[in-house]
Regions:
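Glycine-rich phosphate-binding loops of nucleotide-dependent enzymes
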Residues: 1-75
């Protein structure tokens, strides 16, 4: 969870670095509670509840999912 406890400006920088690493051809496995930021940069995402995968899909698809919005994105 690279953004845990960090100021928003620092979080933005961390995610920019993660994206740059990925653009260089490196696969990144990211475990992150900040679902909004993580899904924005994810090619593929998993939603876990009580240790089980409940949803999977592209980051974009998961951001649009109504259940994900309600439970994790505060909308």
């Amino acid at each position: 969870e690279p953004s845990l406890g960090l100021a928003p400006l620092v979080v933005k920088g961390i995610f920019e670095i993660i994206q740059e690493i990925n653009k260089q051809g490196v696969t990144v496995l990211l475990i992150e509670q900040n679902a909004n930021m993580a899904l924005k940069i994810a090619d593929l995402g998993y939603v876990l509840e009580t240790g089980r995968i409940t949803l999977t899909g592209s980051g974009r698809d998961l951001l649009k999912n109504e259940d994900v919005k309600k439970a994790y994105l505060g909308t």
